[in-house]
Every structure is written in structure tokens, then in C-alpha cells.
């Protein structure tokens, strides 16, 4: 009994602590939530250790995320040049963010991009062809919003250049030393994306957009993603993952609508572990995103999800729960 309690204690410590030691990738959480909490929707900045420029992984909250992150000291090492007319938030948006990687075009993943577009600088939007098509058809169309893209309806303001990524093909990321490969994910009958970024040393970081488990989605998309990541696990090159857990385990499969629970996440990660053997994911840093904000007068879903992940974490992974404004190194 005492040994079991100690095991739970050590697992809890691994969940609630994450050292800010030097790593291959630097991230800043501009938005951590899924669903209805406007101003704190899914968005992460990332850069390799060798780069000074960031790219953004989804863009649910952009300017508000930059404001909160600056207030929390996430950009304390960045100095605005004397020649710049901008605040630090403006300088970051216009000069240091060099592109957007959009996993899918649901509003909670693109709202910040759309709202900030009038004052943004020229940059690429990377995505699978279907995602970019949704952006130009549904948002940048002179009906919902002016067309800031280089394709689509009506006059094109040419601020954003749509870059259609070919699934499974590595492509360079402009104005960085990184490259990227993208793969489609299944999201309740729609398509989402996992982006795998690789730095100049061959280290990789995986960002998963919204996704359901293969078993529920009747898909093999997650298994395909794990098979691409498996060789990097074997080489010790997978430095971290950001992946969603939108709901607690109490949510029935029929109500997941293309999302994960703690149980389903660990089952999916077990597929990756099986590809390299027991213990191969020990100490892997896995950041949890997209926890849905709840209006119910009950325990915070984030607290419940933390507890439930602890209970089933027989993989030895280090679960991290970033808050808006947090800067983490992987």
C-alpha cells in the first residue's frame, strides 16, 4: 500500500513539474484552451534553439496571447530595436513571427489570425490543401473578412501566401533553420493535421491539431503519425509533443466529436511505445492542449484530466499542462 502511494506521488511530481532547462525547441503558449474561452484559444509559438524567429502552431489567440505572454515575462530576452516603431507585441507580430501552421480551419484555431490580419505583416500560411482552401473560402472572402490572401474570392491583398504542404513530404520553413512534415488526422469526419518540425540537428517536435482516437474515428491516421515518429523515438530525437485532451474520461465516445480523453490519449501513446518497446517513452515531455472550458459549477476539467492522466500513466511520460503565457523548452 505504501509503495503504491509512493508511485502515485512520484507520478504526480512528474506531471506538475517541468524544468526550463536548455532544449532543442522553445515554445510560448499564446492560447491553451479549446472551445468557448475567447482570448485564450489554441495557439503556440515555437522556434528551434538555433533560430531567433518563431512560427505559430494554430492561431486561436494571437495578439491577446502575445500581451499575456509579455506580461508573464515570456519575451524578457527579446529586445525591440531602437529603429522599430512598434511595442514589443507589435514587433513580435510583425517581425519575429514568420508564419502560421494551421491544423484545420475551425474558428477556435484561426480566430486570432483573422482578427489580427489587418495589422499583421506579410507571411506564409502553411497547411494541408484542404485547410488552406477552407481559410480562403470561409473567412478571407470579402464576406466574413477581407481577402488578405494571395488566392480566393475578389481582390487579393496578398498579405498571406498559402503554402499547401504535401502529406509525408519534408519542406523547409522559410526564415528559420527548421523543416516540417505534415500528416492528416481524423477529426469527427473532417480533417486536421499533425505537424512534425525538425531542427538543423535532426531533433523533432510534434504538434497535433484536434484529433480523435483511431478506434473511435474508424481511421488509421494516428497510427500513421506514430509510425513516422517511431524512428525519432528510437534515436532519442523526439523532444516533445503537444496534443489535445479536450474532455474527461466520463465523456462517452459518441460525444467526443473528434477529440481525446485521458484514457484515449494514453492508449494512443501506447501504440507509439509498442513500436519501440516497453519504456521507450519514459520521460518524454507531452504538453496537453485544448482542454475545454466548462460553464458548470463543478470541479475544473483540467484538475480532473490531470488526475486521470496520473492514474493511467504507465508509460512514464512527463505530462505538462501549459497555461497561457508560459514559455517552455523541450
Curated annotation (Swiss-Prot):
EC number: 3.1.4.17
Record's signal peptide: 1-22
Protein name, UniProt field: 3',5'-cyclic-nucleotide phosphodiesterase
GO biological process, alphabetically ordered: cAMP catabolic process; negative regulation of glucose mediated signaling pathway
Keyword terms of this UniProt record: cAMP, Hydrolase, Periplasm, Signal
Biological function: Seems to allow the organism to grow on cAMP.
Compartments, record wording: Periplasm
Reactions it catalyzes: a nucleoside 3',5'-cyclic phosphate + H2O = a nucleoside 5'-phosphate + H(+)
Transmembrane segments: none
Pfam families in the record: PDEase_II (PF02112)
Family, as annotated: Belongs to the cyclic nucleotide phosphodiesterase class-II family.
InterPro entries referenced in this protein's UniProt entry, alphabetically: cAMP-PdiesteraseII_CS, Pdiesterase2, RibonucZ/Hydroxyglut_hydro
Alphabetized SUPFAM superfamilies for the sequence: Metallo-hydrolase/oxidoreductase
Cellular-component GO terms for this entry: periplasmic space
MF (Gene Ontology): 3',5'-cyclic-AMP phosphodiesterase activity; 3',5'-cyclic-GMP phosphodiesterase activity
Listed PANTHER family: 3',5'-CYCLIC-NUCLEOTIDE PHOSPHODIESTERASE 1 (PTHR28283:SF1)
Amino acid at each position: 500500500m505504501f509503495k503504491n502511494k509512493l508511485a502515485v506521488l512520484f507520478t504526480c511530481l512528474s506531471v506538475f513539474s517541468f524544468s526550463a532547462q536548455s532544449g532543442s525547441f522553445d515554445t510560448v503558449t499564446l492560447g491553451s484552451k479549446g472551445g468557448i474561452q475567447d482570448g485564450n484559444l489554441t495557439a503556440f509559438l515555437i522556434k528551434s534553439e538555433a533560430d531567433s524567429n518563431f512560427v505559430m502552431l494554430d492561431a486561436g489567440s494571437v495578439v491577446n496571447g502575445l500581451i499575456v505572454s509579455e506580461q508573464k515575462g515570456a519575451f524578457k530576452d527579446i529586445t525591440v530595436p531602437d529603429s522599430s516603431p512598434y511595442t514589443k507585441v507589435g514587433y513580435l507580430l510583425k517581425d519575429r513571427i514568420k508564419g502560421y501552421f494551421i491544423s484545420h480551419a475551425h474558428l477556435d484555431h484561426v480566430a486570432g489570425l483573422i482578427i489580427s490580419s489587418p495589422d499583421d505583416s506579410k507571411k506564409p500560411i502553411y497547411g494541408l490543401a484542404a485547410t488552406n482552401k477552407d481559410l480562403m473560402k470561409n473567412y478571407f472572402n470579402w464576406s466574413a473578412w477581407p481577402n488578405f490572401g494571395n488566392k480566393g474570392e475578389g481582390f487579393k491583398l496578398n498579405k498571406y501566401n498559402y503554402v499547401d504542404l504535401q502529406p509525408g513530404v519534408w519542406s523547409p520553413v522559410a526564415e528559420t533553420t527548421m523543416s516540417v512534415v505534415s500528416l492528416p488526422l481524423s477529426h469527427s469526419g473532417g480533417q486536421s493535421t499533425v505537424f512534425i518540425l525538425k531542427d538543423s540537428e535532426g531533433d523533432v517536435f510534434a504538434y497535433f491539431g484536434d484529433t480523435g482516437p483511431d478506434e473511435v474515428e474508424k481511421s488509421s491516421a494516428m497510427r500513421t503519425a506514430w509510425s513516422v515518429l517511431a524512428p525519432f523515438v528510437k534515436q532519442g530525437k523526439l523532444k516533445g509533443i503537444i496534443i489535445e485532451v479536450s474532455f474527461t474520461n466520463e465523456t462517452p465516445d459518441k460525444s467526443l466529436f473528434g477529440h481525446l480523453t485521458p484514457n484515449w490519449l494514453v492508449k494512443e501513446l501506447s501504440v507509439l511505445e509498442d513500436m519501440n518497446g516497453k519504456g521507450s517513452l519514459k520521460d518524454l515531455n507531452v504538453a496537453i492542449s485544448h482542454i475545454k472550458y466548462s460553464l458548470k459549477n463543478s470541479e475544473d476539467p483540467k484538475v480532473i484530466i490531470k488526475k486521470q492522466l496520473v492514474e493511467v500513466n504507465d508509460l512514464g511520460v512527463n505530462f505538462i499542462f501549459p497555461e497561457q503565457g508560459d514559455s517552455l523548452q523541450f
